[in-house]
Amino acid sequence: MILFPSVDKLLERVDSRYSLIMLASKRAHEIDKYRIDKWRAAHPDKAGETVSLEGDKPLLLDHYDSNKSVGMALEEIEAGLVTIDPDQHEDLQD
């Protein structure tokens, strides 16, 4: 159960709960990948491989109330920084 941001505020940004879940999930995966790649780049002796952060989608807010990637994704959605691409959304519905 999420307490912040509220589901009602989040649903003002997307058209359905399903869209909200899909958008938050995809963004959370991007955040996780960015954090892992950033850690690997900072610790090349422990990571075992070199990692380039070019092309990764960095964190969009300066401060997050949540430490978990799903919560961070929801905060970005509430701020209007992460949205559904209407062209891609229409393709999925066909």
From Swiss-Prot:
<keyword id="KW-0240">DNA-directed RNA polymerase</keyword>
<dbReference type="GO" id="GO:0003677">
    <property type="term" value="F:DNA binding"/>
</dbReference>
<dbReference type="InterPro" id="IPR003716">
    <property type="entry name" value="DNA-dir_RNA_pol_omega"/>
</dbReference>
<dbReference type="InterPro" id="IPR006110">
    <property type="entry name" value="Pol_omega/Rpo6/RPB6"/>
</dbReference>
<dbReference type="GO" id="GO:0003899">
    <property type="term" value="F:DNA-directed RNA polymerase activity"/>
</dbReference>
<comment type="similarity">
    <text>Belongs to the RNA polymerase subunit omega family.</text>
</comment>
<keyword id="KW-0804">Transcription</keyword>
<dbReference type="GO" id="GO:0006351">
    <property type="term" value="P:DNA-templated transcription"/>
</dbReference>
<dbReference type="GO" id="GO:0000428">
    <property type="term" value="C:DNA-directed RNA polymerase complex"/>
</dbReference>
<comment type="subunit">
    <text>The RNAP catalytic core consists of 2 alpha, 1 beta, 1 beta' and 1 omega subunit. When a sigma factor is associated with the core the holoenzyme is formed, which can initiate transcription.</text>
</comment>
<keyword id="KW-0808">Transferase</keyword>
<dbReference type="Pfam" id="PF01192">
    <property type="entry name" value="RNA_pol_Rpb6"/>
</dbReference>
<keyword id="KW-0548">Nucleotidyltransferase</keyword>
<dbReference type="InterPro" id="IPR036161">
    <property type="entry name" value="RPB6/omega-like_sf"/>
</dbReference>
<protein>
    <recommendedName>
        <fullName>DNA-directed RNA polymerase subunit omega</fullName>
        <ecNumber>2.7.7.6</ecNumber>
    </recommendedName>
</protein>
<comment type="function">
    <text>Promotes RNA polymerase assembly. Latches the N- and C-terminal regions of the beta' subunit thereby facilitating its interaction with the beta and alpha subunits.</text>
</comment>
